A protein has these predicted regions:
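Acidic, low-complexity Ser/Thr/Gly/Pro-rich repeat segments typical of extracellular/periplasmic
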Residues: 21-189, 194-200, 212-218, 235, ...
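Structured interaction patches on ligand/partner-binding surfaces of diverse proteins
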Residues: 125, 202-240, 344-345, 443, ...
Length: 557
């Protein structure tokens, strides 16, 4: 009996142990694992020479997602024939289907897209090692950084320069690396050659730049790694979308008999928000009619609202025609048109204010302010200014002018600077704002705001190292967390100063304004146009109210 009991006990213990081995799950409760995986060992060791095996091995600090690893593995130069992968625990063996080339330095790059198995933590940085099938390691290297909102995971393409330089991006690169979470990258083990480097946010990870899908960073120059030139640093990139597609109409539907809602493929140039660029064509009667108002739908820049001047017949076939549709990159499409779904639903809604910039009861700068008021419909603009008052809270009038971004957007600008630390009111009666159907409001609208104190501003000053006026340098102070807030100025000597700056976190950078248009040029991929050279100050500047940061030393690279 005792022997049988012991056998049952041993069997039970073995079953428990086997179950534990077969189902290795993290214990319940406790802190969530946030530790990124790391490469802890490789075969062959970094910088091995005379390598003649047909496989390499990479060991991680924990189990990783196999698919993420395979998509993040790049071996340069490209290995013909493909690879086979086999896993043992947290170690992967990569076998080469064809023999490696003789006297070649290979670089293995494990990109930062690798994630662990349980919590999908990404590698903090890419990892690379080199080995050679010959008796020496090519030690040439290129380093830099990609500056983007999300800089991790960007691929760095390196091409040896030959005769077909304008078709490089149609082929896979000779060498590949990937940025870590800071945007830094290294291209190691490069052979002696001239190189052209691109940064590509490769959506499909196929190592071919897709103009319609991928963001790209263009180099400011090509790189020569010949003879004693073995290292090039600070090949930095800014990413952008090389858009070559003109905007088009997608859909047009009348929400009532006086409003046509049109969806486009992208936002158009605001200079085309004018009725004269459009017309309505009734193909049933072969008659044309005019657009009375056109404006952008608030918060949806790719949607426009058109107000027809004449009534459209619900039984007829009607088209909206644009003389030209153009985006901000000057991509244009002539004579686009779209068939409309007609409605005879009455328009009885009174016009209203739907938003303002700045917001109601907020504070703005007293120097050259602009107040933008968004309405939900187009309106008659003749003599509208005489129905608007602009005063301080004591009733003192402020001289002002008005203009219109489109037929439903009013911009109010004082003719001189306002006073600091003071309250102001813009008033108008909505019964003076009349839409195309004669609908009007019946209430008094008041927009209240205040100006900031001049004491709340901050500033920064310092010195430029390696200053060269022939580079036509422009210095930019750009907000770290407020999109669109930046200050820039052309610098003509080694000293610089920014004053009247809103407090906050900023990064400081410069670009060489070679075309003198006071705007950074990202370049162009095909045919190649180099980007403008730029450099970024290493530290984030924390600018506090009423305090100027001085003695910033910015060395241009």
């Amino acid at each position: 009996m005792a022997a049988k009991s012991r056998k049952k006990l041993v069997t039970l213990i073995l079953l428990i142990l086997l179950a534990g081995c077969a189902n290795q799950l993290p214990p319940g409760g406790g802190e969530v694992d946030k530790i990124p995986p790391e490469v802890v060992d490789v075969y062959p060791p970094d910088e091995t020479i005379n390598f003649d095996d047909d496989y390499i091995e990479i060991e991680f600090s924990e189990y990783v997602d196999k698919r993420s690893f395979q998509e993040a593995l790049f071996i340069s130069p490209f290995i013909e024939g493909g690879l086979d992968f086999s896993w043992t625990s947290s170690t992967v063996t990569i076998e080469f289907k064809e023999k490696l080339k003789k006297d070649i330095t290979y670089t293995v790059n494990v990109g930062s897209d690798v994630v662990d198995l349980n919590n999908k933590n990404r590698m903090a940085n890419s990892y690379s090692f080199t080995f050679s099938t010959g008796n020496k390691i090519d030690r040439r290297m290129i380093t830099g950084r990609v500056y983007a909102e999300k800089p991790e995971g960007v691929l760095i393409y390196a091409y040896r320069l030959g005769t077909e330089t304008d078709t490089l991006l149609k082929a896979k690169p000779d060498y590949v690396s990937q940025t870590g979470n800071t945007g830094d990258y290294e291209l190691k083990g490069l052979s002696e050659s001239n190189y052209r480097i691109f940064a590509v946010l490769d959506k499909y990870r196929d190592l071919i730049y897709d103009l319609d899908q991928d963001l790209i960073g263009i180099p400011c120059k090509d790189i020569s790694l010949i003879a004693d030139d073995t290292l090039f640093t600070n090949m930095n990139f800014k990413l952008f979308k090389a858009d070559t597609t003109a905007p088009r109409f997608l859909k047009g539907i009348m929400t009532d008999k006086k409003h046509i809602l049109v969806t486009l493929t992208e936002e158009i140039d605001k200079r085309l928000l004018k009725p004269s660029n459009y017309l309505l064509f009734d193909s049933t009667t072969n008659e044309k009619s005019q657009v009375q108002y056109v404006y952008q739908k608030y918060g949806k820049p790719a949607e426009l609202i058109f107000v027809p001047k004449d009534k459209l017949n619900i039984d007829n076939s009607v088209y909206l025609i644009a003389d030209v549709l153009k985006d901000t990159l000057e991509n244009k499409y002539q004579n686009d048109f779209i068939h409309l779904t007609i409605s005879d639903r009455p328009d009885t809604s009174a016009i209203n204010v739907i938003a303002t910039e700045p917001k109601q009861n907020s504070s703005i700068d007293f120097v050259d302010p602009k107040i933008i008021i968004y309405f939900d419909d187009g309106f008659e603009k003749n003599d509208i200014q005489k129905h608007i008052t602009f005063t301080d809270t004591l009733g003192n009038e402020v001289p002002f002018k008005i203009n219109f971004d489109d037929d439903a957007t009013l911009v109010v600008s004082p003719l001189k600077d306002l006073k600091a630390d003071k309250d102001y009111i813009i008033k108008f009666n909505l019964n003076r704002f009349i839409d195309s159907e004669g609908n009007k409001g019946d209430s008094l609208y008041q927009f209240k705001f205040s100006t900031i104190s001049g004491l709340d501003f901050t500033g920064v000053s310092g010195n430029i190292g390696n200053f060269d006026n022939e580079l036509n340098p422009v210095l930019v102070l750009e907000s770290y967390n407020r999109k669109g807030l930046q200050y820039q100025k052309k610098i003509t000597n080694e000293n610089f100063e920014f004053d009247r700056i809103e407090a906050g976190k900023y990064f400081l950078w410069y670009y060489s304004d070679t075309d003198s248009n006071f705007q950074y040029d990202f370049g162009w991929p095909q045919p190649l146009k180099y980007s403008e050279r730029f450099s970024v100050y290493g530290d984030t500047l924390k600018l506090k109210p009423r305090w100027t940061v001085t003695d910033v030393q910015f060395n241009l690279k």
